[in-house]
């Protein structure tokens, strides 16, 4: 018995030493597109791009990234990291201070050329636990998309061989896959102009882990604004998602005739969720989609508006926000949710395109909808446009038109109704 206890103590001590050693060896690196050269990645001699450092990163490291536009190593448009790290953007070029959505924007994008990557812009898939964080990055896939015509009003899902262009990437901005028993955070990011089939933010929890998604602006994307996945298929030790103070606007269907995509938040089945103080607005389908029936989730103090078919869905039951407490079976402690005709300062040019786009059987959709403030004139009013007697016009042939970073950030700078959604960090 004594020997067994000694053996277990020795193994525990060794494990503690390994963890302590790993933390002690963690490095802090610096990246600047303006000054960067080589791989020292110090504050005085920063690297040029995150992609140039990936091979030397270890669990526990931190990468600080200065303002500027980053297209990835060799302009690949995608970075994939297999260790647990912190990625922190929004720094001044001398790393003296941060302003991620203002003066010191760290913009992750790419270029569209035949043969380039169409993967998620940033993929983080560690195998061990350490602090995992993506904070203060502006993800803009506009330059990576293939548009029909110079006005950039319609994305193309096909390659344009004559112009040496890839299809628009069918992936989003962030893909985070947690290992078992680990925690991770996505905060203070802007995700825009992505055209995924799945999530613009694709977040994968695992056994006994916690994934926090807070104060992000997710705007003008196809697919699901945030897709919460579970890698753990069990009713025990399900991964927990804490999704709070995010603003998710203009979630488009995959294309004009698609029957998928177009939700602010979509849920996998085997997970635990608390979503609070978010804005889920202008989804081509809905606000929160629980079609897979995640059990006993909490939606508290969220604002739903302008979604076309439902504010919340359980399997094939569509529910308006005013009916959550009566009609939903899988919600618990889900009070304080509401709707409001908010004013979204997204810019007049984009507002006119969005409100004037062609709609498929709009009248039929409105007739069966269980969503709040989803009428054509309500939408125009929230976008700051004059009301029209005839509803949505059918003369704008657009699909995911490119939105400027300035106009996007205007829509997320302050909370709506003083309480809901993100704000400038």
Walk through the language-model features, giving the residues of each.
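Short glycine/acidic-rich loop motifs that flank beta-strands on beta-rich extracellular proteins
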Residues: 74-76, 97-98, 112-122, 143-151, ...
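N-terminal extracellular ligand-recognition/capping segment immediately after the signal peptide
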Residues: 35-37, 50-51, 59-99
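Bacterial N-terminal signal peptides
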Residues: 11-21
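Right-handed parallel beta-helix
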Residues: 89, 130-143, 157-164, 181-195, ...
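Bacterial N-terminal signal peptides that target proteins for export
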Residues: 2-13
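Acidic, glycine- and Ser/Thr-rich low-complexity intrinsically disordered tracts
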Residues: 96-107, 111-113, 164, 293-425
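Right-handed parallel beta-helix/beta-spiral solenoid domain characteristic of secreted/periplasmic
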Residues: 82-157, 161-162
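Right-handed parallel beta-helix/beta-solenoid
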Residues: 24-52, 69
């Amino acid at each position: 018995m004594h020997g067994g206890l000694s053996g277990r103590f020795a193994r525990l001590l060794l494990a503690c030493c390994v963890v302590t050693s790993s933390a002690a060896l963690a490095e802090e690196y610096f990246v600047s597109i303006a000054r960067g050269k080589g791989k020292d990645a110090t504050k005085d001699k920063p690297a040029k791009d995150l992609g140039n450092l990936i091979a030397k990163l270890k669990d526990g490291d931190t990468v600080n990234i200065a303002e500027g536009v980053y297209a990835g190593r060799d302009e690949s448009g995608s970075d994939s990291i297999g260790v647990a790290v912190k990625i922190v953007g929004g720094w001044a070029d001398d790393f003296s201070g941060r302003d991620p959505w203002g003066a010191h924007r760290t913009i992750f994008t790419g270029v569209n050329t035949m043969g380039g990557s169409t993967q998620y812009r940033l993929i983080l898939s560690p195998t061990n636990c350490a602090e995992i964080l993506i904070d203060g990055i502006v993800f803009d896939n506009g330059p990576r998309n293939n548009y029909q015509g110079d006005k950039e009003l319609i994305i193309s899902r096909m390659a344009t061989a004559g112009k040496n262009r890839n299809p628009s990437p069918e992936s989003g901005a962030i893909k985070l896959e947690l290992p078992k028993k680990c925690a991770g955070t996505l905060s203070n990011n802007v995700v825009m102009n992505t055209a995924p089939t799945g999530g613009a933010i694709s977040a994968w929890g695992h056994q006994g882990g916690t994934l926090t998604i807070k104060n992000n602006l997710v705007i003008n994307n196809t697919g699901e604004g945030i897709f919460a996945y579970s890698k753990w298929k069990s009713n025990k030790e399900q991964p927990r998602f804490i999704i709070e103070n995010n603003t998710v606007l203009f979630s488009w269907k995959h294309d004009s005739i698609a029957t998928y995509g177009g939700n602010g938040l979509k849920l996998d089945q085997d997970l635990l969720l608390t979503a609070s103080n978010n804005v889920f607005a202008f989804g081509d389908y809905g606000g929160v989609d629980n079609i897979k029936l995640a059990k006993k989730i909490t939606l508290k103090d969220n604002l739903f508006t302008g979604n076309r078919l439902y504010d919340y869905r359980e399997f094939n039951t569509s529910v308006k926000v005013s009916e959550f407490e009566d009609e939903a079976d899988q919600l618990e402690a889900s009070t304080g949710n509401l709707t409001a005709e908010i004013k979204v300062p997204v810019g007049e040019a984009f507002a006119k395109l969005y409100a004037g786009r062609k709609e498929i059987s709009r009248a039929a959709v409105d007739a069966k909808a269980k969503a709040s403030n989803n009428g054509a004139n309500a939408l125009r009013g929230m976008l700051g446009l004059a009301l029209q007697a005839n509803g949505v016009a059918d003369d704008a042939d657009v699909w995911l038109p490119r939105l400027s970073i300035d106009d996007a950030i205007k829509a997320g700078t302050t909370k709506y109704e003083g309480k809901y959604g993100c704000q400038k960090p």
